[in-house]
């Protein structure tokens, strides 16, 4: 199957400038293509993974990827379908974030070996060497204001107000494509569907300035079956950086994907063949309660992003927490699995009576409730049920002399951190 047709089969092609011409180009030889990543945070997130993995699929098919870090455009801020203008970051912050993004991309694209090894570029390298006058003369003259205002991403901001800085963003992204086309023979740009207006500014500039032929292909912005924007957990982005979203949290995210989305996401986010995914679909529909599709998703994506060791650790944390076996996990694993639960910092020398502790830490609202919970066996310390109303937290309860884990009922966890 032609790589373009496989991408369509996987639901990864949203829009193209010329589908037949692009398919033919991908069939006839190696195509140089690029995807841009503005450093708007210190990590990429799951939303970026669609374009990243699409880029990797093309590389595996023999095409050559260019990964563009937007050191210049990141200083400006893309207005596409944003309700308000982005806060401008300092150069130092953008450089720092850009360096982190470089490291993350190297986990997915092959930068070291092969004729089609990936190339990393930064648009700050060319924008920092062009004067404002030259940019207006050599680039700005190819764009009419009517053309720029016709972009849907701009139309949505006209009534509420858009700064010239953001208005000019599409020309900057268009110039990126022109620079890569001129210097590296890059003829294809890949990006999210919200980038269509900015991306086609590049094909227009290449056509008008050098009479060249270039292509754009957008990948869809992924939503779940309810229409909710994909890639967020409890309203927060699921980051690729393990310090921002732990492998365990990412594992749980995929494990909790709805049945209606699971098989579709296998096509988008894994490198399993379409035949393998079809086999999983059949088994999944026969026994959805076994959650084969979600478990496969979690295994494939966590391993891809963080490695097999992190995946196995996430599985172990999940199993031990489900069984209530707190002592079967290291403090490092517990902190990963219990990130986000209420924490209470205490002095090491404190003698903490269980009743007072439950109230002051907010586990329960009153001493009466605390006594009831302890008497009824609803309170656990490091997995052990506590029914002694006079119980006091001791050195023996400090795991690795660092934390104590309290559980109320089956699911409500609380962590004591000792200073």
Swiss-Prot record:
Gene3D superfamilies: HUPs, RNA-binding S4 domain, Tyrosyl-Transfer RNA Synthetase
Catalytic activity: tRNA(Tyr) + L-tyrosine + ATP = L-tyrosyl-tRNA(Tyr) + AMP + diphosphate + H(+)
GO terms under cellular component: cytosol
GO biological process, one term: tyrosyl-tRNA aminoacylation
Domain (S4 RNA-binding) ranges: 352-419
Motif ('HIGH' region): 39-48
Pfam families assigned to the protein according to its UniProt record, in alphabetical order: SYY_C-terminal, tRNA-synt_1b
Location(s) in or outside the cell: Cytoplasm
Assigned protein family: Belongs to the class-I aminoacyl-tRNA synthetase family. TyrS type 1 subfamily.
Function as written in the Swiss-Prot or TrEMBL entry: Catalyzes the attachment of tyrosine to tRNA(Tyr) in a two-step reaction: tyrosine is first activated by ATP to form Tyr-AMP and then transferred to the acceptor end of tRNA(Tyr).
Name recorded for this polypeptide: Tyrosine--tRNA ligase
């Amino acid at each position: 199957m032609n790589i373009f047709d496989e991408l369509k089969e996987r639901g990864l092609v949203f829009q193209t400038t010329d589908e037949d011409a692009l398919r033919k180009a991908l069939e006839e030889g190696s195509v140089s293509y690029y995807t841009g990543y503005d450093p708007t945070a210190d990590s990429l997130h799951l939303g970026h993974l669609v374009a990243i993995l699409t880029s990797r699929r093309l590389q595996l098919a023999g095409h050559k990827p260019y990964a563009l870090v937007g050191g210049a455009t990141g200083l400006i801020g893309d207005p596409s379908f944003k309700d308000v203008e982005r806060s401008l970051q300092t150069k130092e912050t953008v450089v720092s974030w850009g360096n982190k993004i470089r490291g993350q991309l190297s986990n997915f694209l092959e930068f070291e070996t092969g004729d089609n090894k990936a190339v990393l570029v930064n648009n700050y390298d060319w924008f920092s060497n062009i004067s404002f006058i030259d940019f207006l003369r050599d680039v700005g003259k190819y764009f009419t204001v009517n053309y720029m205002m016709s972009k849907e991403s701009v139309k949505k901001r006209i009534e509420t107000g858009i700064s010239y800085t953001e208005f000019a963003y599409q020309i900057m992204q268009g110039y990126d494509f022109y620079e890569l086309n001129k210097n590296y023979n890059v003829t294809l740009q890949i990006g999210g569907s919200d980038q269509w207006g900015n991306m086609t500014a590049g094909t227009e500039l290449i056509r008008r300035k050098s009479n060249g032929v270039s292509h754009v292909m957008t990948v869809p912005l992924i939503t779940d079956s309810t229409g909710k924007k994909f890639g967020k957990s409890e309203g927060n982005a699921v980051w690729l950086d393990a310090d921002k979203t732990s492998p365990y949290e990412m594992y749980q995210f995929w494990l909790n994907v709805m049945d209606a989305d699971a098989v579709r996401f296998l096509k988008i986010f894994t490198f399993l063949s379409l035949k393998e995914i079809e086999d999983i679909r059949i088994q999944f529909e026969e026994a959805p309660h076994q959650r084969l599709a979600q478990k496969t998703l979690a295994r494939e994506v966590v391993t891809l992003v963080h490695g097999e060791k992190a995946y196995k650790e996430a599985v172990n944390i999940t199993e031990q927490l489900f069984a209530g076996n707190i002592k079967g996990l290291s403090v490092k694993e517990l902190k990963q699995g219990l990130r986000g639960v209420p924490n209470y910092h205490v002095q090491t020398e404190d003698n903490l009576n269980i009743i007072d502790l439950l109230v002051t830490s907010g586990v329960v609202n009153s001493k009466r409730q605390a006594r009831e919970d302890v008497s009824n066996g609803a309170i656990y310390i490091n997995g052990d049920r506590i029914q002694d109303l006079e119980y006091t937290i001791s050195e023996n309860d400090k795991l690795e002399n660092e934390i104590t884990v309290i559980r109320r009922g089956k699911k409500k966890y609380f962590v004591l951190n000792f200073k």
